[in-house]
Amino acid sequence: MRHIKTAKAHKAPVVGFTLLCFLVLASTFALSRGPKTETIEASAMGTGTQLGAVIGVTLDIYEWSTPADRQILIESFTKGQNQGLVNALSKMKAVGHCSITGTIGYDVSYIRMVPTPTGRKIVFVTNRLIRFGEAYFDTQSQSFNLTAGEFDLNDTDKSKSTGSVYPATQLIIDKQGQLQYDLRENPWKLVDVLDWKGTPGVN
């Protein structure tokens, strides 16, 4: 759910260009599926004006993206900023699928994972589906054309696994030269995170 009022966009700081090693794409509606190697499920709780709302989020991972894919995204963002990134993501094949309650979801074209002291972090960015009203009235919200999120998986205490989803965002560089999420609406907090490590070709 998106804010109706035209308030100032929120900004979430991200240190340096290392964020690009986590980038994820969702193209348009999901058409292709592959064998799942892992499935992560969570409940997303609204914050701010969405407080009290709860939706389900599922990320099916078929395979991890390569260092070559990461380099393409870094170069594309450097040359074309947020739109360059969106264009590059739209050309990549699907390596997963992201589903949200009430939608059929999106194909995911880039997924990256890094180890942490307690487990793993998986951060994703998807191409956001622009709504009819946004396109018809040519609203400013169309520039927030990514949906981003992250899972912090705790392998030692799974009850401490958390995450966040940013429904409408874009990537910008601030005055200090740092990469930031520029948020159109409040983030959603991920709770009750379940990590299902499946068998390729089976589940």
Annotate each predicted stretch with a short phrase.
Residues 34-203:
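Long, low-hydrophobicity ectodomains and other hydrophilic envelope-associated domains
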Residues 30-32:
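Boundary at the C-terminal end of the N-terminal hydrophobic targeting segment
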